[in-house]
Regions:
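Phosphate-binding/switch loop-helix module in NTP-utilizing enzymes
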Residues: 96, 102-164
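Walker A (P-loop) phosphate-binding motif
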Residues: 2-36, 41-46
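General beta-strand structural signal in soluble alpha/beta enzymes
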Residues: 42-46, 133, 154-159, 177, ...
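Conserved catalytic-core segment of NTP-binding enzymes
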Residues: 88-93, 136, 140-154, 159-340
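Short active-site-adjacent helix-start/loop capping segments
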Residues: 21-22, 50-54, 81-82, 164-166, ...
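A generic structural motif
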Residues: 43-46, 277-285, 344-355
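N-terminal phosphate/diphosphate-binding loop that engages ATP/GTP or pyrophosphate donors
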Residues: 30-121, 333
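N-terminal charge/polar-biased segments
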Residues: 1-10, 36-40, 331-359
Length: 359
């Protein structure tokens, strides 16, 4: 099922609600599925992944297994990480490491990481690897383009922690949100927070796309065709845009960049003027406000839309916790399905992928 969901898209980001959410298990399943379909894939990460044990929790975790022909973008120092990448058996022995996969270097990127420059290579054998890619979304977008130029048919970006900016359409065509019991001992909190994150990723695209792209400032207030004559007013400061909304009559407000709680509070002060107001942001990853303030705005009659819609393909659930507070897998799956209301498929990494534990 996972392969069929992703098949129409050229790139996908795996986004974790927390560490040990099941991302590596999902990634390995995708790699295996695409191998069966004989498609060329490329892998990178916005953080480090593939190590044998979690560097924070010190718990055992699954490694990333790749096949001959896979394109990989990873940090230079990981080229000789134990049991991972090497030019040859002799090189591995010289560095005191066991040979993992042999590889062919395709390109250097000039993108720095704490573990050295990001190098693009092709696996020449099957084996385990570690990933560590660039930390900036703009760099990921450029890296993705280069991997396509080098022959990749699909690109998978493995996210670190809660880097929901990976869901930006500029970074990938689609996203999978991974949640698990490691997020919180409280199953209700995990479900509620995951459903809220999913809701932000599924916000509809505004019908005012043409007009909002014409807006040059960070904020814009749009009026209808009534007494205001279809006007739009642009501002560089939120306070001035919020003040105009409070005066009433506005149909929409555009907010570029991040939208934190301070921005939400400025709009909440508009009171009745929020009824029917469309709040437009660039994409769901820019909404940094709390669930509480989001609900306040929605209850006041506002609705959220985005300039660039994210394609959330699935939410995966992992009932196992690295901290020991496991969930009942049926209860967790059912609660997530109920919370999402059928708007997106929910996949249990234990039942779907036939594993007893997942990272």
């Amino acid at each position: 099922m996972l392969y069929e969901l992703i098949k129409p898209y050229s790139s996908v980001s795996l986004i974790g609600m927390c560490k040990n959410a099941g991302k590596t298990t999902v990634l390995n399943r995708l790699i295996k599925d695409w191998r069966r379909m004989d498609e060329s894939i490329a892998l990178t990460s916005i953080g480090r992944d593939g190590e044998r044990s979690d560097l924070v929790t010190n718990t055992k975790k699954p490694e990333i297994f790749v096949y001959d022909g896979t394109i990989i973008a990873t940090a230079e120092k990981l080229l000789f990480a134990g049991g991972n990448l090497s030019d040859s058996g002799n090189d591995a022995q010289k560095n005191g490491m066991n040979s993992g996969i042999s590889r062919e270097i395709l390109d250097t990127t000039g993108m720095p990481t704490p573990m050295g420059e990001v190098i693009i290579l092709r696996a020449c054998s099957d084996g385990f690897i570690q990933l560590a890619g660039p930390s900036m979304t703009a760099q990921l977008a450029r890296l993705k383009k280069r991997m396509f130029e080098l022959g990749a048919a699909k690109v998978i970006i493995d996210g670190a922690l809660s880097r929901k900016s990976l869901a930006m359409p500029a970074v990938s065509d689609s996203a999978i949100l991974c949640s698990g019991a490691s997020y919180s001992p409280d199953i209700r909190k995990t479900v509620e927070d995951t459903c809220f994150s999913a809701e932000l990723m599924m916000l509809p695209q505004t019908e005012r796309t043409e007009y909002v792209h014409q807006c040059k400032q960070k904020y814009g207030v749009f009026f209808g065709s009534g007494t205001h004559g279809g006007e739009q007013t642009e501002f560089s400061e939120l306070s001035r845009a919020a003040e105009l909304v409070r005066k009433g009559g506005a149909e929409a407000v555009l907010m570029r960049g991040g939208v934190p709680d301070s921005a939400a509070n400025a709009l909440i002060a508009a009171g009745r003027a929020l009824n029917g107001l469309e709040i437009i942001c660039e994409d769901g990853s820019r909404l940094l406000l709390s669930h509480k303030n989001y609900e306040k705005l929605v209850r006041a009659g506002a609705r959220f839309t985005v300039m660039n819609k994210t394609r959330l393909l699935a939410v995966t659930v992992n009932p196992f916790s690295a901290k020991g507070s496991h969930y009942n897998k049926t209860e967790f799956y059912d609660a997530m399905c109920s919370g999402l209301g059928g708007r997106v498929p929910v996949l249990d990494v234990v039942s779907e992928f036939g594993c007893e534990a997942a990272e």
